[in-house]
A protein has these predicted regions:
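Extreme N-terminal leader/targeting segments of oxidoreductases
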Residues: 1-28, 143-144, 192, 197-201, ...
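Conserved N-terminal glycine-rich FAD pyrophosphate-binding loop of Rossmann-like flavoproteins
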Residues: 4-6, 56-80
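Glycine-rich FAD pyrophosphate-binding loop
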Residues: 29, 45-65
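Glycine-rich Rossmann-fold phosphate-binding loop(s) that bind the pyrophosphate
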Residues: 32-36
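Conserved FAD-binding subdomain of flavin-dependent enzymes
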Residues: 43, 73-94
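Feature captures the FAD/FMN-dependent oxidoreductase FAD-binding
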Residues: 88-163, 167, 173
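Glycine-rich beta-alpha-beta "Rossmann" dinucleotide-binding loop(s) and their flanking helix/strand
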Residues: 154, 170-198
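A conserved FAD-binding loop/helix module that cradles the flavin
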Residues: 229-257
Length: 258
């Protein structure tokens, strides 16, 4: 069979175009396809929600790929093992309450299962603003990451979502944008994004699940973003809290949409 280069191009453009149009109005839009964001998306999709994710980088997975200092092993605690088991990620006991998993297997497996659950992931797209109606966040303003990097003057497009989840990690990008540009008050003690604190694994893992919740009308936070918004510590290369955080937000949104 002779291959037609133009037909290959047409197939890619038509398929992506249709996928993007379908993503312009969804139940939940998640910014950041790290472990917390993907876990949140997976459990929402399993509940029948229409979910789309936007990841500014070429690859998904956030900082999980590199484990600790590029040693591609990651640690989970006992209470997160059930999530690993559900995804089919192999883990092994290091000592009581400390489980190890291969970081590459973990990211690739979670990503695969998330997409197969029905989630659409768009990489190389950044959220540069939020859409607000009646003091509630109800969508995202999107542009290619390459436009931002090249500092080109190119207008973005907008999509609508019943709920938006900020899973952008340490930067808490969506929450900071909402605070800075809209004047929406965050549900923190200061009404603002407080910024993450220095390393303390135990406290960070305990607070990350507690802090994963609605931070402004229509906007939820999960993963390291939650601790950045609420001023809690970072936790380093232990990832149980990330998965538990994403699952919690998925359940809260599902309960709200019932």
């Amino acid at each position: 069979m002779q291959l037609d280069e133009v037909k290959i191009s047409k197939a890619i453009i038509e398929s992506y175009n249709n996928k993007l149009i379908d993503a312009l109005n969804v139940d939940v839009a998640i910014v950041g396809a790290g472990p917390a964001g993907m876990c949140c998306a997976y459990y929402l999709a399993k509940q029948g929600k229409k979910v789309v994710m936007f990841e500014r980088k070429l690859s998904v997975g956030g900082g999980m790929w590199g484990g600790g200092i590029m040693f591609n092993e990651i640690v989970f605690q006992e209470k997160a093992k059930t999530i690993l088991d559900e995804f089919g990620v192999r883990s092994r006991l290091y000592e009581k309450n400390y489980y190890l998993a291969d970081s590459l297997e973990t990211v690739s497996t979670i990503c695969s299962k998330t997409i197969k659950a029905g989630v659409k992931i768009f990489n190389l797209i950044s959220a540069e603003d939020v859409m607000i109606r009646k003091n509630r966040i109800c969508g995202l303003v999107l542009n290619w990451t390459a436009v931002e990097i090249a500092n080109l003057h190119v207008d973005p497009i907008t999509m609508a979502a019943d709920f938006v989840v900020d899973a952008t990690g340490h930067a808490a990008e969506v929450a900071r944008i909402a605070e800075r540009k809209s004047g929406i008050s965050m549900k923190t003690s200061t009404g603002k994004v407080k910024g993450e604190r220095s390393m303390w694994a135990e406290a960070g893992e305990d607070t990350i699940v507690k802090n994963s919740k609605e931070v402004a009308p229509g906007l939820y936070v999960c993963g390291m973003c939650a601790n950045a918004v609420y001023g809690a510590p970072r936790m380093g290369p232990i990832f149980g809290g990330m998965l538990l955080s994403g699952k919690k937000v998925a359940q809260e949104i599902s309960n709200k949409q019932k």
